[in-house]
UniProtKB/Swiss-Prot annotation:
Pathway(s) this gene product operates in, as recorded in its UniProt entry: Purine metabolism
Cofactor: Co(2+)
Signal peptide from the UniProt entry: none
Catalytic activity: dGTP + H2O = dGMP + diphosphate + H(+); dATP + H2O = dAMP + diphosphate + H(+)
Upper taxonomic lineage: Viruses, Duplodnaviria, Heunggongvirae, Uroviricota, Caudoviricetes
Pfam families for this protein: dATP-dGTP_PPHyd, dGTP_diPhyd_N
Family: Belongs to the Caudovirales dATP/dGTP diphosphohydrolase family.
The protein's Enzyme Commission number: 3.6.1.9
InterPro entries assigned: dATP/dGTP_diPOhydrolase_N, dATP/dGTP_dipphydrolase_MazZ
Superkingdom assignment: Viruses
SUPFAM superfamilies: all-alpha NTP pyrophosphatases
Designated name of the protein: dATP/dGTP diphosphohydrolase
Length: 385
C-alpha cells in the first residue's frame, strides 16, 4: 500500500510513454515535410539540429508548451532532434558534424577506435556496457578537442585577410579559456562592462576599444558569422545611403526615403489621423506626392472640440465592390457626383472602431465623376495599415 501511495501518478522512469512515441512520430512527419528537401540535398548538420533543440527547450522554459507552427508539444520536437543526432553518430555520418568542438577518446588504445570528423573533429565511439554501447570503459577519460570550424574554401581567404585571422585567433583563445560561453554571456559583458567603460572616461584607451572588439568578434564567431564579409556588405549599403544628424539626439542617422504616408503626415501634422485618406480622386493618387499633400492640407478643416460627437451619414460611407473601394453614388446630371463636406478619411474597419477614434472630415471642393473615386486596393492598403 505504501508503494501505491508514493508511486501514484508519477512518471514510470523505466518505460517509454506510448503517447510520447506517437507524438514524436507525428513531429517526424512534420519535420519531413519542412526539412525533407534540405535533408535530401545536403543533410542536416549537427549545429542546425542542436540549435533547433535549444529553441524548443527555451520555449518550454519560458512557459510555452505547444509549438504554434506544428501544434505539437515542444518536447516532441526536442526528442526528434535528439533522435537525429543519435542516428548520425550511430551511422558514422561525420561529414555532418560541424560543431565547434566535439568529444573524443584521446587514448589510442581503444576497443573500437575513433572516427575522424570534419575540420579536425573526432567523433567518440563508445564501448560495450551493461545496457549496450552506452558507457566508456572504466579508467578511460574523455577530452575536449577545440578547433575553429572553417571550410576549406575559406582557408585561403583567411590566410590573407587580417580581420578573419584576428577573428580566428580570438575564437581559438576563447574556446580554450571559456568553452561553455554563450552569445548572451558575451553580449551581457560587452553591454554592462566594456561599453560603459568607454563612455565614462576611457575612450582614449586603445585597450578598452580592443575589449569591445574582441567580444564583438567572438559573438560573431559563436553565431557562425564571417564578420569581415558582413562589414563589407554593410559598408556598401551605408555608402549608398544619405546621412544627417538628428537634431533631437545629436546622433548621425541615415535618412529613410519618405513614402506617400510620411509625406501626407508631414503636411497635416497636428490633425490626428487626418492623413488616413480612404478615398481620394485617382488623379491625385497617381500624381505627385507633394501635390496630394498640399491638396489634403487645404481641404482639411480645423479639428472640432468634441470629435466624438461627429455624425457620419450612412450615405457617405464607402461600399466595397470586388477589389475596389467605391463611395456611395449620389445624384447629378450625367451621373456626376458632387461631394461637399463628405468624410473621406475612413478606415476600412471604421464601423468596428470606437467613437473615440472617429476620423475627421475633409471637403472635396471639385466636382468629379463617380469613376474617379474608384481606387484599387493596392493603392489604398499602404494608407490604412
Amino acid at each position: 500500500m505504501s508503494g501505491n501511495k508514493f508511486d501514484q501518478e508519477k512518471v514510470d522512469l523505466h518505460v517509454l510513454d506510448p503517447f510520447f512515441i506517437e507524438g514524436t512520430a507525428r513531429v517526424a512527419q512534420f519535420g519531413e515535410q519542412k526539412y525533407g528537401r534540405s535533408n535530401w540535398m545536403q543533410g542536416l548538420t549537427q549545429t542546425r539540429i542542436i540549435n533547433a533543440i535549444k529553441r524548443h527547450i527555451a520555449q518550454i522554459e519560458k512557459g510555452e508548451d505547444i509549438d504554434e507552427e506544428s501544434g505539437f508539444h515542444h518536447a516532441y520536437h526536442a526528442a526528434w532532434g535528439c533522435q537525429v543526432l543519435a542516428y548520425q553518430h550511430r551511422n558514422g555520418q561525420t561529414h555532418l558534424d560541424d560543431r565547434r568542438w566535439s568529444e573524443s577518446v584521446r587514448d589510442a588504445d581503444t576497443k573500437i577506435g575513433t572516427c575522424e570528423g570534419i575540420s579536425g573533429h573526432t567523433v567518440p565511439c563508445m564501448y560495450e556496457g551493461p545496457f549496450g554501447r552506452l558507457h566508456p570503459v572504466d579508467g578511460e577519460k574523455d577530452g575536449l578537442v577545440m578547433s575553429f570550424v572553417q571550410s576549406e574554401a575559406d582557408e585561403g581567404t583567411a590566410q590573407g585577410d587580417p580581420i578573419q585571422q584576428l577573428q580566428q585567433m580570438i575564437s581559438e583563445w576563447a574556446d580554450q579559456v571559456y568553452p561553455d560561453r554563450t552569445v548572451e554571456n558575451a553580449l551581457t559583458k560587452m553591454m554592462l562592462h566594456e561599453i560603459p567603460e568607454l563612455l565614462h572616461g576611457k575612450a582614449m584607451d586603445p585597450a578598452e576599444f580592443a575589449d569591445v572588439a574582441i567580444l564583438l568578434f567572438d559573438v560573431a564567431h559563436l553565431q557562425g558569422i564571417d564578420i569581415a564579409q558582413a562589414m563589407r556588405e554593410k559598408m556598401e549599403i551605408n555608402q549608398a545611403r544619405d546621412w544627417k544628424i538628428d537634431p533631437a539626439t545629436g546622433l548621425m542617422s541615415h535618412v529613410k526615403p519618405k513614402g506617400m504616408m510620411e509625406t501626407i503626415r508631414d503636411a497635416v501634422q497636428g490633425i490626428g489621423d487626418a492623413a488616413r485618406i480612404m478615398a481620394a480622386p485617382s488623379r491625385l493618387l497617381n500624381g505627385n506626392n507633394m501635390e496630394l499633400a498640399e491638396y489634403t492640407a487645404e481641404t482639411l478643416p480645423k479639428p472640432p472640440e468634441k470629435p466624438w460627437e461627429i455624425t457620419i451619414p450612412n450615405w457617405a460611407l464607402k461600399t466595397e465592390e470586388g477589389t475596389h473601394i467605391k463611395l456611395r453614388a449620389g445624384s447629378g446630371v450625367f451621373g456626376r457626383v458632387k461631394y461637399q463636406s463628405q468624410c473621406i478619411l475612413m478606415h476600412k474597419n471604421m464601423r468596428k472602431r470606437s467613437h473615440l477614434e472617429t476620423y475627421y472630415c475633409a471637403t472635396i471642393k471639385d466636382t468629379v465623376t463617380e469613376d474617379e473615386y474608384n481606387v484599387p486596393w493596392s493603392e489604398i492598403e499602404p494608407w490604412t495599415n
